UniProtKB/Swiss-Prot annotation:
PANTHER family from the UniProt entry: ERGOTHIONEINE BIOSYNTHESIS PROTEIN 1 (PTHR43397), HISTIDINE-SPECIFIC METHYLTRANSFERASE SAM-DEPENDENT DOMAIN-CONTAINING PROTEIN (PTHR43397:SF2)
Induction field: Expression is down-regulated by ralstonins, lipopeptides produced by the plant pathogenic bacteria Ralstonia solanacearum. Expression is positively regulated by the imizoquins cluster-specific transcription regulator imqK.
Protein name listed in UniProt: N-methyltransferase imqF
GO molecular function, one term: methyltransferase activity
Similarity annotation: Belongs to the methyltransferase superfamily.
Domain of life: Eukaryota
Extent of the signal sequence: none
Biological-process GO terms, alphabetical: methylation
Native source organism of the sequence: Aspergillus flavus (strain ATCC 200026 / FGSC A1120 / IAM 13836 / NRRL 3357 / JCM 12722 / SRRC 167)
Function field: N-methyltransferase; part of the gene cluster that mediates the biosynthesis of imizoquins A to D, tripeptide-derived alkaloids that serve a protective role against oxidative stress that are essential for normal germination. ImqB is a canonical three-module NRPS that assembles the tripeptide backbone of the imizoquins via condensation of Trp, Tyr, and Leu-derived precursors. N-methylation by imqF and phenol oxidation by imqC, followed by cyclization via the FAD-dependent oxidase imqH carry out the three-step transformation of L-tyrosine into tetrahydroisoquinoline.
Keywords: Methyltransferase, S-adenosyl-L-methionine, Transferase
Pathway where it operates: Secondary metabolite biosynthesis
Record EC number: 2.1.1.-
Length: 369
C-alpha cells in the first residue's frame, strides 16, 4: 500500500506518490460489477517469505519485524480508519495537492501506456487520476498491485463502480509484492511504456538505500530505448515533530491497534502464539538523525521467543521495530532518485510547502542531471 523537509514530493517518470483524493459519492443504481480480473504474479507464497523475514529480523542486532505484517486485510481496515482521522495530516495535504495538480502530472501519461499503482489500499485518490485520464480520452491499462486478494477485489470493484462507463481506461489487479511485480515485468517483457504510481509516502517506509534499490529494480524494464518507464511519487517532507507524533501515535490508540495487528499476523504466519500482545506495549518516536518516525513493540518483561529450533531472548524494555515513515527533504529525494538512475523532471508541493510530488525520468548513469 513513502518527503522532504519542505514537504511531500511527487515524481513522474521514475517515481511519483499521491495520497487520498476528495471523497467521491458512488452512483446509486449502476449495474452490478462483473468479476474482477486479478493476475497472481507471486513467485512464492507470502507466508513462506514472511516466515523467514521474521526470523531474519529477530536475528538482527537491532531487532525488527517485517512491516508487511501490518498490511493484511485487518491492517488495511485499520489503516483506512487512520486515513479518515483528523490527526493524519498526510491525507489532507495530498488530497489538496492532487486536486490542484492532477491535470498537470497526468499529462505525462500517454495513450497506450500501462499504469501500475504500487499498493491499492485507498482508491479515492486513484479515481481522480483515472477519471482525468478517461476524460482526456487516453487508452490506459490500469493495474493495481497489492498483497491482499480481498483488498484488490474490493478496491477494483469499487473503482469500476466509480467509473461505470469508462471506455478508455481498463482496470485489473496484480496480486503480489513489489519484488514480485518487478520480476514479473522483467520476465514478461515490456511491450508498452509503464508509468508507476506510488502514492501515500509509501516509498519512505523504506530506508533510503532500500528505496533506491526498489526504484532501480522497477525502472529497468523498457519497451524501447525511447520509452523509459516513469514514476509518479508522493513524499512527505513535514518536519513539525509535534504534528508528526500526533499523526502516528493517535490519542484514540488507533495507531497502536494498527501496529499490534502485526503481532497477530506474525503468530498466524508462525503457527503459534509466539508474540502475546499483553506482554508488549507500543511506542512511537521521532528519529531526527534519519528524519524518520519509528514505531516499536516494547517488551514489558524479559521473555524468550521460540520459533522452530531457535530461541530469541528479549529483555525488559527492549524494542522491536514495527514500521517507519521517513519525512525526507527535497535534496534527499533527489539524491535517492539519482542513485537509482532517475532524473527528477518536475515537482509540486502543497500550500504549506511540506507535502509534494516529483516527476522523474530514467537517465543513463553516465548522464548528468
Amino acid at each position: 500500500m513513502m518527503t522532504e523537509a519542505q514537504g511531500p514530493v511527487v515524481s513522474i517518470g521514475s517515481a511519483t506518490v499521491t495520497y487520498d483524493h476528495p471523497p467521491i459519492i458512488s452512483p446509486v443504481s449502476y449495474p452490478k460489477a462483473r468479476p474482477t480480473q486479478i493476475l497472481d504474479i507471486r513467485k512464492r507464497t507470502s507466508r513462506i517469505d514472511l516466515y523467514h523475514e521474521i526470523l531474519a529480523g529477530l536475528r538482527a542486532k537491532d531487532k525488527e519485524l517485517p512491516s508487511l505484517l501490518l498490511w493484511n486485510d485487518r491492517g488495511l481496515d485499520l489503516f483506512s480508519e487512520i486515513l479518515n482521522s483528523d490527526e493524519y495530516y498526510p491525507r489532507r495535504r495530498e488530497t489538496q495537492l492532487l486536486q490542484t495538480h492532477v491535470n498537470e502530472f497526468t499529462r505525462s501519461i500517454s495513450s497506450g501506456e500501462r499504469l501500475i499503482e504500487l499498493g491499492a489500499g485507498n482508491l479515492q485518490k486513484t479515481v481522480s487520476v483515472l477519471r482525468c485520464l478517461e476524460q482526456s480520452r487516453k487508452h490506459v491499462e490500469y493495474c493495481a498491485l497489492d498483497v491482499s486478494h480481498a483488498a484488490l477485489q474490493a478496491s477494483i470493484t469499487e473503482l469500476k463502480a466509480q467509473l461505470p462507463f469508462a471506455s478508455y481506461v481498463t482496470i485489473r489487479g496484480l496480486l503480489g509484492t513489489y519484488n514480485d511485480c518487478a520480476s514479473w515485468l522483467k520476465q514478461s517483457g515490456a511491450t508498452v511504456r509503464t508509468t508507476f504510481l506510488w502514492l501515500g509516502n509509501s516509498i519512505a517506509n523504506f530506508e533510503p538505500e532500500d528505496a533506491t534499490s526498489i526504484l532501480a529494480d522497477f525502472l529497468q524494464t523498457k519497451a524501447s530505448p525511447s520509452h523509459s518507464p516513469q514514476m509518479i511519487i508522493a513524499v512527505d517532507g513535514c518536519q513539525d515533530v509535534e504534528q508528526i507524533l500526533e499523526a502516528y501515535d493517535m490519542p484514540n490508540k488507533l495507531s497502536q491497534k494498527f501496529v499490534f495487528n502485526g503481532l497477530s499476523h506474525a503468530n498466524q504466519i508462525l503457527g503459534s502464539e509466539v508474540f502475546r500482545p499483553q506482554h508488549w506495549t507500543f511506542e512511537g518516536k521521532w528519529n531526527p538523525v534519519k528524519s524518520m518516525h519509528e514505531s516499536f513493540y516494547v517488551a514489558k518483561k524479559p521473555m524468550s521467543l521460540d520459533i522452530g529450533n531457535e530461541r530469541f531472548h528479549v529483555h525488559a524494555g527492549e524494542k522491536i521495530r514495527a514500521i517507519t515513515s521517513g519525512k525526507w527533504p527535497k535534496d534527499k529525494v533527489t539524491s535517492i532518485c539519482q542513485s537509482a538512475g532517475i532524473k527528477v523532471l518536475k515537482g509540486w508541493t502543497d500550500e504549506e510547502g511540506s507535502y509534494g510530488k516529483r516527476v522523474t525520468q530514467v537517465y543513463s548513469r553516465g548522464s548528468s542531471c
